[in-house]
Amino acid sequence: MAANPSGQGFQNKNRVAILAELDKEKRKLLMQNQSSTSHPGASISLSRPSLTKDFRDHAEQQHIAAQQKAALQHAHAHSSGYFITQDSAFGNLILPVLPRLDPE
């Protein structure tokens, strides 16, 4: 049984059309970017992964900050000790502050 050549031809035409549309859009964006070089604030960055990464990092930072705040409030409410928020090599959100006692 042979492969359907008309179906394959349609797929190739569809791919070519999609690639042509993408190329046209890319050229349009590049032209906009080049025309706005006189206005540095109006330039369009074509690197979306860095924007997505920055957004993800910011969201992660906010989530960690919320967790730190909750852990700190819980520790202060249920303990007589003193705690601070600080990055820890072991992944702890808060660290206890231990007083130094003079040796007797």
Curated annotation (Swiss-Prot):
- Location(s) in or outside the cell: Nucleus
Q: Which residues carry this modification: Phosphoserine?
A: S50
Q: Please tell me whether the keyword Glycosyltransferase is annotated for this protein.
A: no
Which residues does this entry mark as bearing N-acetylalanine?
A2
Q: Does the keyword Coiled coil apply?
A: no
One GO cellular component assignment for this chain's record is: nucleus
Keywords recorded for this protein, A-Z: Acetylation, DNA damage, DNA repair, Nucleus, Phosphoprotein
Q: Which InterPro entries match?
A: SOSSC
Q: What does the record list as GO biological process?
A: DNA damage response; DNA repair; double-strand break repair via homologous recombination; mitotic G2/M transition checkpoint; response to ionizing radiation
Q: To which protein family does this belong?
A: Belongs to the SOSS-C family.
Q: How does it assemble?
A: Component of the SOSS complex, composed of SOSS-B (SOSS-B1/NABP2 or SOSS-B2/NABP1), SOSS-A/INTS3 and SOSS-C/INIP. SOSS complexes containing SOSS-B1/NABP2 are more abundant than complexes containing SOSS-B2/NABP1. Interacts with INTS3; the interaction is direct.
In UniProt terms, what function does this protein have?
A: Component of the SOSS complex, a multiprotein complex that functions downstream of the MRN complex to promote DNA repair and G2/M checkpoint. The SOSS complex associates with single-stranded DNA at DNA lesions and influences diverse endpoints in the cellular DNA damage response including cell-cycle checkpoint activation, recombinational repair and maintenance of genomic stability. Required for efficient homologous recombination-dependent repair of double-strand breaks (DSBs) and ATM-dependent signaling pathways.
This chain's protein is named SOSS complex subunit C
Organism source for this protein? Mus musculus
Q: Which gene encodes it?
A: Inip
